[in-house]
UniProtKB/Swiss-Prot annotation:
GO terms for cellular component: cytosolic large ribosomal subunit. This is Large ribosomal subunit protein uL6. Belongs to the universal ribosomal protein uL6 family. Keywords: Ribonucleoprotein, Ribosomal protein, RNA-binding, rRNA-binding. One of its GO terms (biological process) is cytoplasmic translation. Part of the 50S ribosomal subunit. This protein binds to the 23S rRNA, and is important in its secondary structure. It is located near the subunit interface in the base of the L7/L12 stalk, and near the tRNA binding site of the peptidyltransferase center. GO terms for molecular function: rRNA binding; structural constituent of ribosome.
Length: 179
């Protein structure tokens, strides 16, 4: 049996989980999310504890058991606490600011880079060098953070660019030259 799949999920207060056809709907104080439930799996909700159960031991069902439980856990945490990713900007003259709902960045190009946040994502800028991406959908928060980082990924010589706050940039030595 899948070790991740058989683990129970304790629901926080004000969070509801119900199965509708091929989806699991999760409602909470921050919003509503749904994740697909694969054939051969079912959701059992008892007294605020959710368990995923398999109807058979097919290899595909066993493989999807842990995945579905992890996706469901991400939805539960998202609607109760939310997800966030922090980015940092390094480099002389590099900065970010909010203009309406858009994120406007000066990243050393001849033009400003404008990023429009998708629905359900909130972007905050602190001190012009720190960007915080928040939302209830873990996948979407990570994708938005990756899109922003891709506008100017950190380079390996001085580390200039946009990086995740917890990311370590391995630096290279520059040219040594003749002596």
């Amino acid at each position: 049996m899948s070790r991740i799949g058989k683990a129970e999920i304790k629901l926080p207060d004000k969070v509801e989980v119900k199965q509708e056809n091929a989806n699991i709907k999760v409602k909470g104080p921050l919003g509503e999310l749904s994740t697909p439930i694969f054939e051969g799996l079912s959701v059992k909700n008892e007294n605020g504890i959710v368990k995923l159960e398999r109807s058979n031991e097919d290899q595909k069902v066993v493989a999807l058991h842990g995945l579905t439980r992890a996706l469901l856990m991400n939805c539960v945490k998202g609607v109760s606490q939310g997800w966030e990713k922090n980015l940092e900007i390094n480099g002389v003259g590099y900065r970010a600011q909010k203009r309406g709902e858009d994120l406007v960045m000066s990243l050393g190009y001849s033009h400003e880079v404008v990023y429009k946040a998708p629905k359900g994502i909130k972007i905050d800028v602190q001190e012009q060098l720190k960007i915080k991406v928040t939302g209830i959908d873990k996948q979407l928060v990570g994708q938005v953070a990756a899109d922003i980082r891709s506008k100017r990924p950190p380079e390996p010589y001085k580390g200039k660019g946009i990086k995740y706050a917890e990311e370590f940039i391995k630096k290279k030595a520059g040219k040594t030259g003749k002596k």
